[in-house]
Structure formats: structure tokens, C-alpha cells
Amino acid sequence: MKVYLDNAATTPIASEVIEEIQPYLNNYFGNPSSTHAFGRKTKNAIEINRKKIADLIQAKNNEIIFTSGGTEADNMALRCAVFDLNVKRIITTKIEHHAVLHTAECLRDQENVEIIFLATDHNGNPDLVQLESILNDKVNTLVTLMHANNEISTLLPIKKVASICAKHKHVYFHSDTVQTMGHYTFNLSETPIDFLTCSAHKLHGPKGVGFLYVNQKISLNPLITGCLLYTSDAADDLWC
């Protein structure tokens, strides 16, 4: 008998998830942008599940943007922070997921964004004293620190980091929560986080599905253009 012990990399789809999505593979295939019955059925399912996700993390419906997974969500958070929020500096660590590290490096090379890597201890904990010291200037900054490291399992004190960042109006906080979403209780009505990312395949969902939480105080432009967009709320404006 084979035993699978790599859930930190990906998980099998739960049977109840397969049962839930099966009708939308066979029968309810309408384009959610269409106004006919097939489209309305699909659009309604999207909005119902957007609300379920928002309720799970104590967020608002229009703060949930569906993506193709964690990599797109991380890219959207970092790139839109630079392009739309005028971020000039990214603070992170050298042990982040490549979706964050490689995107930050691209923004450094292409947009001249400064990257500062926080020191980490032998357990992978970032130096938060160093973080506080750096943030004392007035440079528009994105702090991006993963909640749980996918290689060594170090857990970030996310509420403490959020509190540090919230002291500075020029600072935005993004956390890659791909490893902890569904396992950790988030209350975004109380914790001042600007961006969170999630990928369904890490919590027994399908591959190719994820979301980005964007605090409603932030206005972003679409990262990917070229398709008919919903216009009912801010989240739909960014979803294709």
C-alpha cells in the first residue's frame, strides 16, 4: 500500500469537493458573464462561494478576488502594489516562496524597486526589530512575509507583524497564507492585513483555483486584461 506524506506540497481532492463541483463540469457550464439562464446559474454559484470564503475569514464579499492559484495571487499582490500603490520598496526574507521572491526580483530589475531581506534566525523567524527600524522612514513599502513556511513550517506571528505595519500609513502588508488557509482562523475585521493569498489544492480542493484577499480600502487595476469583466463590485472588476 502506498502512503502519501506530502500534503505540504499538494493534497488530494476531498470527495465532498468533487461532489460539489461535478454539476458545474457536466451541466452548469454557462459563461458567468452571460445574462441567460446558464450564465446566471454559474454567476450565482460564484457569488455564493465568494461569500462563503469571505465569511470564513471575516472579510467582505468584494474583498475576495478569484485567481488561478497562489502564484497568480502573490503576483497580483506584489505587482499591483508597485503599479497601483506606488510602492518603491519590498521587505521580505530569503526563505519566501518563489512566487514572491522571483516576482520581487522581477520588480527590482524591471521597475527599480528596492528589495530588503530581513535577517532570520535558525528557525526561520524574521527579525521584527529590524523590520520596525526600517519602517521608520517614509518610503512606500510592501512587507511580504509568508504565514507558514512550506519547507520548515515556521509560523509567522501574523497579528504582531500586521500591528507593526499598521502603525505606518505608507506601509502595506501581504502574507502568503497558502499553507495555513483552512487550518488557521483568520479574522480580517480585526487584523489589519492588506493582502492574503490562498490556493485550493493545499486544502483538498482542485488545482488551478485560488483567491487573493484585498482590503477594501485599496483600489487595484486588473493585472490581466482582455476579457469581459463584471461590474457589480470591486472584486468582479478584477475577475475574468
How would you describe each model-predicted region?
Residues 230-240:
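Single conserved hydrophobic/aromatic residue that forms the stacking wall/gate
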Residues 1-232:
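Pyridoxal 5′-phosphate
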